């Protein structure tokens, strides 16, 4: 049996976020697992088989020169974006492959420091760039606008490009809102949450409204559960309410499904209506929530609960609420002890033990380009690298992106 290319690579990912704070694409990190040459054509065919027209655009970030050379040589026109590090262009072989790949119609992305942009003859080989702002650029970007009215404020941010390593909310907002950046990779979650520290976190207004509309349309119980699972804070608040003295249920509610069944749709809608006036409309929180949802989906896929739906839902919930401490600002153990959850969830999220810890730790590791950490987790938990990569690609291919309306 021919080994799949997914067994010879270590993959990781990072979301690309648009100016509307919606998912715009995925940066896919690809590391050679060994010194063996990776069949880049096989990798691209594997991705093509899993991807659909609605899947997010991909930016493939090869983490070795050899893998990049193979991608540049073998990728056909219409392949995902391929990243080329600026410093690697000093390698004459890579530069030659870049020029021929550009002539074949490949879409290439230059990655590097905004202060070291390529010369025009090199730059024309690239469709876009993934830029890092220098500290002095960040300071300049955040200077107040000119005092004289009518004087245009110039930005150091180049419009239409992508940016990475943006650690502050103010700089992210400058890039996306003022600098007209195409996207930012990753998200300044810590600073966004810090900027909101004086305001208790609330569930998403959009998710609450979506769930109310689904109830009005008499959609399925599975649909209600899926929508509620789009917001970790809404799911948590719902379960806290279900287990409160206000409802007086005789048995503890340990899952969203059970809570939906026990509470009844009219009562759920009344409860949602009570949440709506205080709900969050801050667009900067959308990437925070969606990142938690992707982590939950990955955790469930990695543990491959199969046909046991209750178990799959429990694993999803484990991944969804695993970072609630970041939203609520108190220890995760304290938060989870308010609910009669499965001990398996508490063990994985707080104690880092038990049957769910492998999937949860791997889902978190895959959010980075740390190949050593991913390899170590595969060894520790005896996880098959090919299956890990396949689970990752399946989850990523199912994500939805906001696309511009088709031209008439």
Regions found by a protein language model. Give the residues of each.
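Bacterial c-di-GMP phosphodiesterase EAL domain
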Residues: 1-81, 86-93, 287
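Conserved alpha-helical "signature site"
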Residues: 55, 142-408
